[in-house]
Amino acid sequence: MDSNTVSSFQVDCFLWHVRKRFADQELGDAPFLDRLRRDQKSLRGRGNTLGLDIETATCAGKQIVERILEEESDEALKMPAPRYLTDMTLEEMSRDWFMLMPKQKVAGSLCIKMDQAIMDKNIILKANFSVIFDRLETLILLRAFTEEGAIVGEISPLPSLPGHTDEDVKNAIGVLIGGLEWNDNTVRVSETLQRFAWRSSDEDGRPPLPPNQKRKMARTIESEV
């Protein structure tokens, strides 16, 4: 087992413990508590996969964090400011668009829309989003464009459900790609979005989605939207 995998799990366990103590003092807001519950489920799953005890991992994670804090200056503890990256122009973001065969799905705090009438097109996904620590932090808006510039799909945050992770965004993109490819469209993702959401891609601009996810997502669009 990779040592970085183990130490990452240990630190995550300890930081979750700190956040839980914070929540126990009734100081956390609703999004904070929601993330706490989701992360607890994730840690349990990772612990089972790795064969590690969470309580033991938490103690080890505490030692790692304490060692890091002893070496850190106050200057190093400052949170870097997020960067705002734009694939789309203001006109592309604000343009109204219409669907001949509208399909819509809500996935967590993200709304996915697409036009099921679009077939046999080359489509590119563009997004405007913020980045921190060289990873996607917050999606502002994602849209799917044909080569002719027509908008045929969209992913946007729901104002009533604030807060999403980069994994939420990647899952939503998987749904959109699956739905568009169901109609024999060829979909690629902008280089900027690939870099900060996946940090890798295929040569044709596809993010590394496994084939079974593509089929699953396509069926989801077809049957549930």
Curated annotation (Swiss-Prot):
<feature type="region of interest" description="RNA-binding and homodimerization">
    <location>
        <begin position="1"/>
        <end position="73"/>
    </location>
</feature>
<comment type="function">
    <text>Inhibits post-transcriptional processing of cellular pre-mRNA, by binding and inhibiting two cellular proteins that are required for the 3'-end processing of cellular pre-mRNAs: the 30 kDa cleavage and polyadenylation specificity factor/CPSF4 and the poly(A)-binding protein 2/PABPN1. In turn, unprocessed 3' end pre-mRNAs accumulate in the host nucleus and are no longer exported to the cytoplasm. Cellular protein synthesis is thereby shut off very early after virus infection.</text>
</comment>
<keyword id="KW-1190">Host gene expression shutoff by virus</keyword>
<dbReference type="InterPro" id="IPR000256">
    <property type="entry name" value="NS1A"/>
</dbReference>
<feature type="region of interest" description="PABPN1-binding">
    <location>
        <begin position="218"/>
        <end position="225"/>
    </location>
</feature>
<keyword id="KW-0945">Host-virus interaction</keyword>
<keyword id="KW-0922">Interferon antiviral system evasion</keyword>
<keyword id="KW-0694">RNA-binding</keyword>
<keyword id="KW-1088">Inhibition of host RIG-I by virus</keyword>
<keyword id="KW-1035">Host cytoplasm</keyword>
<keyword id="KW-0899">Viral immunoevasion</keyword>
<dbReference type="InterPro" id="IPR009068">
    <property type="entry name" value="uS15_NS1_RNA-bd_sf"/>
</dbReference>
<keyword id="KW-1102">Inhibition of host PKR by virus</keyword>
<feature type="region of interest" description="CPSF4-binding">
    <location>
        <begin position="175"/>
        <end position="210"/>
    </location>
</feature>
<dbReference type="GO" id="GO:0039540">
    <property type="term" value="P:symbiont-mediated suppression of host cytoplasmic pattern recognition receptor signaling pathway via inhibition of RIG-I activity"/>
</dbReference>
<feature type="short sequence motif" description="Nuclear localization signal">
    <location>
        <begin position="34"/>
        <end position="38"/>
    </location>
</feature>
<keyword id="KW-1113">Inhibition of host RLR pathway by virus</keyword>
<dbReference type="Pfam" id="PF00600">
    <property type="entry name" value="Flu_NS1"/>
</dbReference>
<dbReference type="InterPro" id="IPR004208">
    <property type="entry name" value="NS1"/>
</dbReference>
<keyword id="KW-1103">Inhibition of host pre-mRNA processing by virus</keyword>
<dbReference type="GO" id="GO:0030291">
    <property type="term" value="F:protein serine/threonine kinase inhibitor activity"/>
</dbReference>
<keyword id="KW-1192">Host mRNA suppression by virus</keyword>
<protein>
    <recommendedName>
        <fullName>Non-structural protein 1</fullName>
    </recommendedName>
</protein>
<dbReference type="InterPro" id="IPR038064">
    <property type="entry name" value="NS1A_effect_dom-like_sf"/>
</dbReference>
<comment type="subunit">
    <text>Homodimer. Interacts with host TRIM25 (via coiled coil); this interaction specifically inhibits TRIM25 multimerization and TRIM25-mediated RIGI CARD ubiquitination. Interacts with human EIF2AK2/PKR, CPSF4, IVNS1ABP and PABPN1.</text>
</comment>
<dbReference type="GO" id="GO:0039657">
    <property type="term" value="P:symbiont-mediated suppression of host gene expression"/>
</dbReference>
<dbReference type="GO" id="GO:0030430">
    <property type="term" value="C:host cell cytoplasm"/>
</dbReference>
<keyword id="KW-1262">Eukaryotic host gene expression shutoff by virus</keyword>
<keyword id="KW-1090">Inhibition of host innate immune response by virus</keyword>
<comment type="similarity">
    <text>Belongs to the influenza A viruses NS1 family.</text>
</comment>
<keyword id="KW-1114">Inhibition of host interferon signaling pathway by virus</keyword>
<dbReference type="GO" id="GO:0042025">
    <property type="term" value="C:host cell nucleus"/>
</dbReference>
<dbReference type="GO" id="GO:0039580">
    <property type="term" value="P:symbiont-mediated suppression of host PKR/eIFalpha signaling"/>
</dbReference>
<keyword id="KW-1048">Host nucleus</keyword>
<dbReference type="GO" id="GO:0039502">
    <property type="term" value="P:symbiont-mediated suppression of host type I interferon-mediated signaling pathway"/>
</dbReference>
<feature type="short sequence motif" description="Nuclear export signal">
    <location>
        <begin position="132"/>
        <end position="141"/>
    </location>
</feature>
<dbReference type="GO" id="GO:0039524">
    <property type="term" value="P:symbiont-mediated suppression of host mRNA processing"/>
</dbReference>
<dbReference type="GO" id="GO:0003723">
    <property type="term" value="F:RNA binding"/>
</dbReference>
<keyword id="KW-0832">Ubl conjugation</keyword>
<feature type="region of interest" description="Disordered">
    <location>
        <begin position="200"/>
        <end position="225"/>
    </location>
</feature>
